[in-house]
Design a protein with these regions (language model features):
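S-adenosylmethionine/decaboxylated-SAM
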Residues: 1-137
Length: 137
């Protein structure tokens, strides 16, 4: 096991994708992954309650544009100093670029890294927010 005691919850709202994910998790995961299928607005509050504080959250924001602000706000209620968020598809549309700007401006966010196809967000108070980092390939 890579991380003994690791607790991982994955949420998927499309049953067909959940079936594929379940197979992949069973083959590759060294720790059991709690895969929950259904509406994010119903699943997320309970998942966050079960987790307490979150260490890492991956947002598949391309397909959930209508829920991005809500998902982000709910998850930020459960951060700690070492929490990291990763957002997929931050440049895929004007709406996503605007959402990414909102994330970068959030008062709890200390550092952001823009990798064009995804964005990484840190909440660590030891990191000083001098600017947002943009990486060009």
């Amino acid at each position: 096991s890579y991380a003994p005691g690791l607790k991982c919850i994955a949420l998927e709202n499309i049953p067909e994708f959940a079936s594929i994910a379940r197979i992949a998790f069973e083959k590759a995961a060294h720790n059991p992954i709690d895969l929950r299928t259904g509406n994010y607005k119903e699943l997320l509050p309970r998942a966050l309650e079960d987790m307490g504080k979150v260490d890492f959250v991956f947002f598949n924001t391309i397909y959930e544009q209508q829920n991005n602000v809500w998902l982000f706000n709910e998850c930020t209620k459960h951060i700690h100093n070492d929490t990291i968020f990763v957002f997929e598809g931050i440049k895929t549309s004007r709406k996503m670029r605007e959402f990414w700007k909102e994330v970068c401006a959030h008062p709890e966010v200390t550092v952001t890294v823009d990798l064009y196809s995804m964005g990484i967000v840190f909440f660590n108070r030891k990191l000083h927010k001098l600017s947002d980092y943009i990486v060009y390939f």
